[in-house]
């Protein structure tokens, strides 16, 4: 999982990427291609 400052570029990398919020953190998840996972990092 990558930790990046802005999820804007992460969510457009693949059409199956979804932005979800868990425990106050924002994540990008992708069920079909899990290597696109990312987390907002501040």
Curated annotation (Swiss-Prot):
Any single Gene Ontology cellular-component annotation: ribonucleoprotein complex
Top-level taxon in the UniProt lineage: Bacteria
Pfam families: Ribosomal_L36
Any one biological process term the GO annotation gives: translation
InterPro entries documented for this protein: Ribosomal_bL36, Ribosomal_bL36_sp, Ribosomal_L36_bact
Keyword line: Ribonucleoprotein, Ribosomal protein
MF (Gene Ontology): structural constituent of ribosome
Similarity comment: family membership: Belongs to the bacterial ribosomal protein bL36 family.
UniProt xrefs under PANTHER family: 50S RIBOSOMAL PROTEIN L36 2, LARGE RIBOSOMAL SUBUNIT PROTEIN BL36B
UniProt-recorded name of the protein: Large ribosomal subunit protein bL36
Organism: Ehrlichia chaffeensis (strain ATCC CRL-10679 / Arkansas)
């Amino acid at each position: 999982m990558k930790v990046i400052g802005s999820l804007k570029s992460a969510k457009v990398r693949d059409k199956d990427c979804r932005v979800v919020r868990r425990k106050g953190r924002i994540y990008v998840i992708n069920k079909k291609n899990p290597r696109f996972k990312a987390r907002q990092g501040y």
